[in-house]
Amino acid sequence: MDAASTLTHAPVSQPWQSLAQGLGFVNEHEGYWWSKLGPPLGKMMNWARYSTSEQYRVLAFLYKYLLPACGPKPGDDGELFWKVFISYDYTPIQLSLNFHNGKMTLRTANIPISDKSGTADDPINQQASVDAIIRQERVLPSQDLRWFNHFASQYFFDKDTAASLKTKVDKLRVQQGVQCMLSHDFPERDVQCKVAFCPLWKAVATGLSNKEIIWDSILGLGDDIIPYKRALAVLEQYTSSENAAKAGVRPVFFAFDTVLKDNYKSSRIKIYYLTTRTAFNSMVDIYTLGGLLKGPDIQKGVEALEVLWKAVLNVPEGWPDDKDLPMNPHRCAAVIFNFELWPGAEFPSPKAYLPAHYYGRPDLEIADGMDYFFKQQGLDGVYGSYKENYLKCLSEVRTHRTNSQPSTMIFLFHSKGPMPTLRCTTSPSYL
């Protein structure tokens, strides 16, 4: 019996199961992906204290608008139809919980794919993203696609050009060359959406650097970009500096909001940077943009980042802050930062992504480290035991034969305190 049949005939106990039984699936591919996404979604929303009605609302959105963007299920040999580098196991959706202001919020990140991805009809997987963002317009009336259309015109290629570009890089590079990614947050009674674009294919086509491509396309927004220029100039100053060169950090992609309402009447611009350096001093230099970002909030952020760094990553005892950690040779083993630009802001806001999958401690030690971090930040009474909730989530998810291993710890410090995020994956390789 396939995954879809198993779900639609299984005893009902959880909202994700009830939804499957009541609605069924368009095809076996969607049934397969729901069987992998449903269990961790249910457990993570229980962990985050979502009410039953809120779980149904979120699940209905994911079922209707994200599930079709997962593409074909893996073949009989376990190989994914189109591997994407959103997570270490190449699956098309990544799930996460964001801890902030006493609440936990479910997040998803998705690189849309379809049965045409990688074929002559869509050689580098562009059309699925367009289809996905148009599909969700019916339930996101505040969605504004002006910026999306601008950047798509800057980054997307016609089929013949895309096919030609594909022959110029190796297979891994093709998979890393994500043209577009959609991310969703699910606060109470709401859906927020971000879209990210990556300059890799345009760099192959033009020979320009990521920085040149990203800056040119952002400045191409014309008058829309004026409120962001001060913060963008600060970021550019560091990007071109000797400090950035020593830290081995470079911009790799950017994102913006598409649902413009309430606190997001104007989009943020988030520019993401990558480095393979892992010395903590280098992390501080990047986080503070070489000292351009200052003040008590930044200092508190650095201090909290150091606690989390040592709590979740496998940092040897007595390891010097100016020395890189023992190198992980995987091509995706890197630290990612993003710098958030708000309209009218003088400076960017930093965020660090700690590579727990490549440099982290064992799972349960990470969970202990998170409990220690929450206690150090005075948050242990707010969120409860991280380890206890993690173990409950993990053990029950594995009952459904789905992997849920933390792959990245994301750290952001606002004036109201730290915002750690746990990212999990759903991995066919563990079935």
Curated annotation (Swiss-Prot):
Q: What is this protein called?
A: Indole diterpene prenyltransferase nodD1
Question: According to its UniProt record, in which pathway does this protein act?
Answer: Secondary metabolite biosynthesis
Record family assignment: Belongs to the tryptophan dimethylallyltransferase family.
Which EC number(s) does UniProt give?
2.5.1.-
The primary gene name is nodD1
What are the recorded GO MF terms, alphabetically? transferase activity, transferring alkyl or aryl (other than methyl) groups
Binding of L-tryptophan occurs at 85-86
Kindly state which keywords UniProt assigns to this record, in alphabetical order: Transferase
Spell out the NCBIfam families in the cross-references. arom_pren_DMATS
